[in-house]
Amino acid sequence: MAKKILVIDDSALMRRVLCDIIDSDIRFQVTDRAKDGLEAFDLLSRNSYDAVVLDVNMPRMNGLQLLQELRKYKIPARVMMASTDTKEGAKTTLDALELGALDFVHKPDSAVDCRGENFRREFLRTLNVVANSKLPTFAAEEKLSEEKGTVKEMMKIINHHPVSVSGSKIVAIASSTGGPKS
């Protein structure tokens, strides 16, 4: 069964190009389209999708604002950013990833370049990864936020009390052998 995809872009031409690319692959099917974040928010609050392809610059509600609203209302979505602004290391890209986007592709400036094989291959590869990833949950994020608060409280206590009673100095080394579970 094909993965259900929502495409959000203010340009009708770009929506058409992205939908054509997605629908050309039997693994995916565009089931809905939106021209801005407000339309998309309405769709996402009523429907579930295997992946969401999201532009950044749009009227009424841009892509970053939509990500903020999804987080605020705890609406889970597997989001892939596709914008001329999303380049590796760009502030917009980092902001989107911090707000919950799972991955990104740099969308060429022209529809002609978007129809090129290199973009098509990269776009579909990224979409496949996003559509098959674990749906983000907000419980893990809340737990991490609580843990950060606990660490901050411990640091206040440690920094508040004098350390050396005997006059001896010690060196403590801490190490982590793992990270968050994937």
Predicted regions and their residues:
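Strand-loop microenvironment adjacent to phosphate/nucleotide-handling motifs in alpha/beta enzyme folds
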Residues: M1-S182
